[in-house]
A protein has these predicted regions:
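Divalent metal-coordination and catalytic microenvironments
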Residues: 65, 142, 161, 171, ...
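Active-site neighborhoods of metal-dependent hydrolases
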Residues: 6-164, 239
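Short aromatic-centered micro-motifs
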Residues: 220
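Short, acidic/turn-prone active-site loops that include or flank metal/cofactor-
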Residues: 1-7, 225
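Extracellular/periplasmic ectodomains of large secreted or surface enzymes and adhesion receptors
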Residues: 225-243
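Glycine/Thr-rich phosphate-binding loops of Rossmann-like dinucleotide-binding domains
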Residues: 74-75, 211, 230
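Solvent-exposed coil/turn segments that connect beta secondary-structure elements
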Residues: 70, 205-207, 225, 232
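Acidic, glycine-enriched loop/beta-strand segments at the rims
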Residues: 149, 167-172, 181-217
């Protein structure tokens, strides 16, 4: 986003100064400071010609992308307000629930800002541009940032990738075949084949018709061990009661 701004050279100089002055800070703190000071300015000064040049370089260099759309649109979409998220929240350790609730209750008191809306749209548009340029995409969530729960957040990421313009099959590949290819593990992961890892999710409905069908899990095969729906529900119940 910073390289796609009309004032990218100015932002780069400022960023170098921020990095120099914050050399003793933790990486996460420094990254957040840069985002806070530069992200909105960069988006307000978005330059399509510059963006296309950046994307051309990424495509030429075969630089794969992980949009983390669920995370980068969370300030607008507020996933923690949904029923599905609230269900997944109950499986987290109690101390994590308590810590998150303090932040969430404060967030609920704030309104979605015009910039939240604009940045969310920018992320969807840019992900589509990345896809249209033929740049490989992988699915990632950066859980637990912004209260994204493990497991559920990946299903959500597949859905928003489709919303951004990928087909359901392309979204599924972004979470399976593409990462295996990126890490040169095609002969072990990412596809159903003899001698590959026996890690599978069996669904009750076709995700190519509706990507949200990835959540309709009938059974899981993990390292060759079969868990039907009853066994999966039992594991979830145990998780709730043993934290």
């Amino acid at each position: 986003e910073l390289s796609c701004a009309s004032n990218s050279d100015e932002l780069l100089l400022q960023r170098q100064q921020l990095l120099a002055s914050g050399k003793d800070d933790k990486g996460g703190v420094l990254r957040s400071r840069i985002h806070k000071e530069q992200r909105q300015i960069a988006i307000e000064n978005f330059d399509l010609d510059k963006a296309n040049k950046v994307l051309d370089v990424l495509a030429k260099n075969d630089t794969w992308q992980i949009p983390t759309l669920t995370l980068n649109t969370a300030s607008k979409r507020r996933p923690f307000a949904t029923k599905e998220w609230q269900e997944s929240f109950t499986y987290l350790p109690k101390n994590v629930q308590e810590q998150w609730l303090n932040y969430i209750n404060n967030l609920k008191k704030t309104e979605v800002t015009p910039f939240n809306e604009k940045y969310s749209k920018w992320m969807f548009d840019m992900t589509k541009r990345v896809h249209d340029k033929g740049i490989k995409i992988m699915a990632g969530t950066d859980t637990p940032i912004y209260f994204l729960t493990p497991g559920r957040s990946l299903h959500e990421e597949l859905a928003v990738l489709v919303e951004a313009g990928l087909s359901p099959l392309e979204a599924i590949k972004a979470a399976t075949k593409n990462p295996a290819e990126y890490f040169n593990l095609e002969n072990e992961l990412g596809s159903i084949a003899k001698n590959n890892w026996a890690d599978l999710v069996i669904l009750d409905a076709n995700p190519l018709v509706d990507i949200n069908n990835t959540k309709k899990i009938n059974a899981v095969i993990k390292q060759g061990n079969y868990f039907d729906r009853t066994q999966l529900d039992l594991l979830l119940d145990q998780l709730k009661t043993t934290k």
